[in-house]
Amino acid sequence: MLRHGISARLVDGYNIIFAWEELKAVAAQDLAAARGMLEDILSDYRGYHRCEVILVFDAYKVKGNPGSVEKRNGISIVYTKEAETADAYIEKTSYQLRRDHRVRVATSDNLEQVIVLGHGSLRLSADAFHAEVEETRGQIAALIEQYNRANRGRNTAKIKE
């Protein structure tokens, strides 16, 4: 489980994919590619914010599916088991984590938002989460640029030696 006190983000994967235009366009051609793009985006987000990210995808319609949890690029990726929706998994997990962690849930499902808010979690609509992710991307780009500027002279000095 998570280290005590660490902040957690629970992300309703398909809800986000079909709410964000850039992912929705990719999903229309290749859903697996859209999932991969979201994983990459959230991996960068996790690294910058130093939080735990749990990305949840529905797999409840897959007959006999036991569900799975994988750790890739620092984020937990959950595929729900047969007869368990992403919403049900997010509700259960936000309830379990609420006591020892600051939990934020990213989804535009209104009922889901009300339920997790009742558990004491914070909620983010897909649009609000997209804005936060874009701001994070800008901050990461600025840090990289600042690092590159600071090290430009050092790298050329080493090459000349």
What do these predicted ranges mean?
Residues 1-11, 15-161:
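Nuclease catalytic cores that cleave nucleic-acid phosphodiester bonds
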